[in-house]
């Protein structure tokens, strides 16, 4: 009986260690640099509205109306997602951690561009080479929330 308990405790400890290892270390260079977000690395596990190449490029979250209201709405939308935790917030910048079903952590960043009528985005996996399109799909899911879909439709 005691051996069984020890095995279960060890198994739970190993599982917890594996899940923690999946989180990876937060990159120290995230944030706003010279008024913009970092470019994506060459690996395909990142998307950015500031990227020039098609592989990494994703459209920003566009809106019509008050920029502060749009950014506030984003701040309210993100925590509704069970995989999302806001970890840094200023009046124009948000950094979030997205947790995948397998326990991996991806970093998301949102930068308000009030003059451009959009919120620039960057989403990147901490570990691995490919994300199988997860970062792109996640940003597109967020885009479908108000007020972004209305602005998308009006801009077309």
Task: Identify the meaning behind each predicted range.
Residues 1-20:
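Sec-dependent bacterial lipoprotein signal peptides
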Residues 22-156:
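Ser/Thr-rich, low-complexity intrinsically disordered terminal regions
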């Amino acid at each position: 009986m005691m051996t069984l308990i020890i095995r279960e405790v060890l198994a739970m400890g190993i599982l917890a260690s594996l899940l923690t290892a999946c989180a990876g270390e937060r990159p120290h260079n995230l944030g706003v640099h010279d008024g913009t977000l970092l470019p994506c690395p060459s690996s395909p596990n990142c998307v950015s509205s500031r990227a020039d190449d098609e592989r990494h490029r994703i459209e920003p979250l566009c809106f019509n109306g008050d920029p502060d209201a749009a950014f506030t709405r984003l701040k309210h939308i993100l925590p509704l997602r069970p995989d999302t935790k806001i970890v840094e917030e200023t009046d124009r910048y948000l950094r979030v951690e997205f947790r995948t079903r397998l326990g991996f952590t991806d970093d998301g960043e949102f930068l308000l561009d009030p003059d451009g009528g959009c919120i620039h985005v960057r989403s990147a996996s901490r570990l691995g080479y490919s994300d199988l399109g997860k970062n792109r799909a996640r940003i597109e899911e967020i885009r479908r929330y108000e007020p972004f879909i209305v602005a998308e439709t009006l801009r077309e």
